[in-house]
Amino acid sequence: MDRIHITGGTPLNGTIPISGAKNAALPLMIASLLTGETLELINVPRLADIAALTRILGNHGVDHMVVGKRPGQTAETGQTVRLTASNVIDTTAPYELVSTMRASFWVIAPLLARFGEAKVSLPGGCAIGTRPVDLLIMALEKLGAEIEIDGGYVVAKTKNGLRGAEITFPTVTVGGTHVALMAAALAYGTTVIDNAAREPEVVDLAECLSKMGARIEGAGTSRIVVEGVARLGGARHEVLPDRIETGTYAMAVAMTGGDVSLVNTRTELLASALDVLASTGTEITALPDGIRVRRNGGGISPADVTTDPFPGFPTDLQAQFMALMTLAKGQSRIRETIFENRFMHVQELARLGARIRLDGDLAVVEGVERLKGAPVMATDLRASVSLVIGALAAEGETQINRVYHLDRGFEALEAKLGRCGARIERVRA
């Protein structure tokens, strides 16, 4: 099993190109099942989760072709892919494939909408709480699907196609909104999605579906209206920049010091997180094609955050921000409201010398003067990168084990950090 070795204490300086967002690319790839024509996606990151979904789509008969890369990206990043679902041979998504990645469950929506049936295994992915699929199933049932759970599979059928309906989510759900959008695009009549997720990745999916011929209004608000159409066609669409990767590298610079330009990204994708970061004493400057992050001396000021759906502070940056706060000059309080059991990184940060106390959904971080390198173990995707950030600022060497979690969500991480001066090396098993 691969490990990453980091020798900390070096400020980051240089330029980091931000990859396409994994959390946008996954539903976009799944949307290829809605049409028999070709969907071309630009700026798709090279990640383990993307490869896993490619295998799942291939199992259904989707043809996948890599045709190039996004201009401005490095050799190891930013691929352009063409997906063609003209010969779907199977509407079953088996356990051995779906269990590797939670988002793959979303294939149930386009399969059901286009073919009238789907059999999809209950999902896997990061082990952060239960994250049930109940809301996704509820949305499909509202649209007229007949659903049963049989042997660990969700079996969905519709006799005469899906029909528009009013869907009100009791809590904000990104996955549920993705599923509702894809299913409603081919449903008969009008679908209204209330309490819809407002995340940029939802907007990106809606924009791509619109290019394919869908009729969608209100994406980016809490109320989305979809007028179903009889068929969707092919399209060409660029995946939006990864706001979580942007925030992660910004926090790495804030923690280690230095001056880094994050390019191929947009400030509006991360407004709340950048505001919080600025309050810690980090200088944030907008660039024409990204942001510049600087911290050249002075301590890190403590700050309190509560994770919330967009436009609030992202849960996917909670672990990274906690790593930053371990060196703050004072106490900070971090409340996690999106997922339960998302503090698994705490005990590993403690191995580096962090002082963190947990009380339910609240983490109280007492800043320390310094961290010291130690062997640590990644527990999930975002927790693993928080250990990278901590290790970059720690004295001495840190060995991070189980880094396959990193490969699920961070494209060319060692190369990007290494070009900015980080002393980071992957040791192959």
Swiss-Prot record:
Q: Which of UniProt's keywords are assigned here?
A: Cell cycle, Cell division, Cell shape, Cell wall biogenesis/degradation, Cytoplasm, Peptidoglycan synthesis, Pyruvate, Transferase
Q: Which residues bind UDP-N-acetyl-alpha-D-glucosamine?
A: 102, 131-135, 316, 338
Known pathway: Cell wall biogenesis; peptidoglycan biosynthesis
Q: What positions are modified (2-(S-cysteinyl)pyruvic acid O-phosphothioketal)?
A: 126
Entry's Gene Ontology cellular component terms: cytoplasm
* Superkingdom of source: Bacteria
InterPro entries of this UniProt entry? Enolpyruvate_Tfrase_dom, Enolpyruvate_Tfrase_sf, MurA_subfamily, RNA3'P_cycl/enolpyr_Trfase_a/b, UDP_GlcNAc_COvinyl_MurA
Q: Which reaction does it catalyse?
A: phosphoenolpyruvate + UDP-N-acetyl-alpha-D-glucosamine = UDP-N-acetyl-3-O-(1-carboxyvinyl)-alpha-D-glucosamine + phosphate
Which residues participate directly in catalysis?
A: 126
- Please provide, alphabetically and separated by semicolons, the GO molecular function terms listed in this UniProt record: UDP-N-acetylglucosamine 1-carboxyvinyltransferase activity
- What does the entry list as the binding residues for phosphoenolpyruvate? 22-23
What EC number(s) does its UniProt record assign? 2.5.1.7
Compartment annotation: Cytoplasm
For this protein, the record's Pfam families field holds: EPSP_synthase
Principal localization reads cytoplasm
Q: Does the keyword Cell division apply?
A: yes
One GO term of the biological process aspect:
peptidoglycan biosynthetic process
Give the similarity note.
Answer: Belongs to the EPSP synthase family. MurA subfamily.
Reported function:
Cell wall formation. Adds enolpyruvyl to UDP-N-acetylglucosamine.
Q: Which HAMAP family match?
A: MurA
Q: What is this protein called?
A: UDP-N-acetylglucosamine 1-carboxyvinyltransferase
